[in-house]
């Protein structure tokens, strides 16, 4: 058993540094025809500042993103576990192409159970736009696109009680970035067409079985990774790129996803 455990841990270290880099076509109800084919690279959960093979996954994902040259890049929180990762984070963000938007996560503010986490003083992330209960209007392919992002404390109710519905504006496409997937349960229909989230790491350590797997982190969570739909809109939950608590993944490979939006 000790050999089996060592082999599993060894593979977990390898898996944590080998991101899946994939394209996913995503039907979005209400998407204007002009935005059919719009490409968004969704990245999440870098967790920089602690030793982890996840750093390799982040580096590889950023290089891949730069080569894809999408219309938009979205980063949905937990950029840092410790402030010491900030210089690397800034170098990585400078390599990302086109408009890039990001939000913070609970690890960025150290409102997490992770004993390694320390709060960072990240207030801006130029050339990316760091959103905190605010949004920005931009024009893509001749249509107005509204990108909004939440402060992660919105769902912890620590220091802010912003209603995510209040962040919506009129636009051809409205996108909400929130670290926590359960924001979908708070949204009213017609506020946002697309929600992008992270946080879950697809369990980070999972036990596969035929037809599925048991996620050891958040085993009963309604949103783990992938695409979810409700009356409030369409949500993509990223498996993320880094690690927390322990520096490996098992049956929960890190991922960078290029979403190709399609009119439903």
Regions from the PLM with identified roles:
Residues 34-43, 48-264:
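Soluble catalytic domains of enzymes that build or remodel membrane lipids, polysaccharides, and related
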Residues 1-34:
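N-terminal membrane-anchoring alpha-helices
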């Amino acid at each position: 058993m000790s050999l089996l455990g060592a082999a599993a841990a060894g593979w977990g270290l390898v898996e944590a540094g080998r991101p899946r880099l994939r394209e996913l076509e995503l039907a979005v109800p209400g998407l204007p025809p002009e935005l059919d084919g719009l490409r968004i690279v969704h990245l999440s959960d870098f967790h920089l500042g602690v030793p982890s093979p996840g750093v390799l996954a982040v580096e590889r994902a950023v290089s891949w993103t730069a080569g894809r040259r999408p219309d938009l890049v979205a980063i949905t929180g937990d950029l840092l576990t410790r402030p010491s990762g900030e210089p690397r984070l800034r170098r990585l963000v400078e390599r990302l192409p086109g408009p890039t938007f990001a939000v913070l996560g609970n690890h960025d503010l150290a409102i997490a159970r992770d004993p390694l986490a320390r709060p960072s003083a990240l207030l801006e992330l130029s050339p990316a736009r760091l959103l905190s209960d605010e949004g920005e209007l931009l024009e893509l392919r001749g249509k107005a696109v509204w990108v909004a992002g939440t402060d992660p404390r919105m769902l912890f109710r620590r220091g802010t009680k912003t209603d995510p519905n209040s962040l919506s504006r009129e636009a051809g496409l409205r996108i909400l970035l929130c670290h926590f997937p359960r924001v979908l349960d708070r949204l009213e229909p017609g506020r946002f067409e697309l929600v992008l989230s992270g946080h879950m790491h697809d369990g980070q350590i999972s036990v596969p079985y035929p037809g599925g797997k048991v996620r050891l982190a958040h085993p009963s969570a309604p949103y783990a990774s992938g695409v979810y739909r409700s009356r409030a809109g369409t949500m993509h939950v990223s498996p993320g790129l880094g690690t927390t608590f322990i520096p490996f993944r098992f049956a929960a490979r890190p991922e960078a996803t290029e979403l190709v939006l399609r009119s439903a």
